[in-house]
Swiss-Prot record:
Gene3D superfamilies recorded: Globins
Sequence positions that bind O2: 59
The Globin domain, residue ranges: 1-142
Cited function: Involved in oxygen transport from gills to the various peripheral tissues.
Gene Ontology annotations of biological process type: hydrogen peroxide catabolic process
InterPro entries, per the entry: Globin, Globin-like_sf, Globin/Proto, Hemoglobin_a-typ, Hemoglobin_oxygen_transport, Hemoglobin_pi
Binding annotation for heme b: 88
UniProt-listed Pfam families: Globin
Protein name: Hemoglobin anodic subunit alpha
Family in the record: Belongs to the globin family.
Assembly: Heterotetramer of two alpha chains and two beta chains.
């Protein structure tokens, strides 16, 4: 679970990176589709899945918007992400293991954009936050 300190670190760091959230999201989704090509199966309806393409940019922005909502409701992530959990579980049928894959890619992308600010302390808190976010997204799978 997230400590009070973790929550403060995540909120502080997120406020710093939110200005580049669309770019970070685009990079993270592009990275996921490249490094884990099996994830492309969920996006077969897109005209293209290459990094930087319009669908990747749009989805990256959408994901980072949802994460921003989760940061703002850090004490109720399951509530903040309930409709997304429902969508991914029951309509899109996304394997919840992919949430952890995306979290890993997102941390790599954040580090590319903010190498100095992404200290070990920030890394630890963001990792814990993203793991809690993945659990919240998997909530409706039960």
């Amino acid at each position: 679970s997230l400590s009070t300190k973790d929550k403060a670190v995540v909120k502080g760091f997120w406020s710093k990176i939110s200005g580049k959230s669309d770019e970070i999201g685009t990079e993270a989704v592009g990275r996921m589709l490249t490094v884990y090509p099996q994830t492309k199966a969920y996006f077969s309806h897109w005209p293209e899945t290459t990094p930087g393409s319009a669908p990747v940019k749009k989805h990256g922005a959408r994901i980072l918007g949802a994460i921003n909502d989760a940061v703002n409701r850090i004490d109720d992530m399951a509530g903040a992400l309930g409709s997304l959990s429902e969508l991914h579980a029951n309509k899109l049928c996304v394997d919840p293991a992919n949430f952890k894959i995306l979290a890993h890619c997102l941390m790599a992308s954040i580090c590319l954009f903010y190498p100095t600010d992404f200290t070990p302390e920030v890394h630890l808190s963001v990792d814990k936050f993203l793991q809690n976010l993945a659990l919240a997204l998997a909530d409706r799978y039960r």
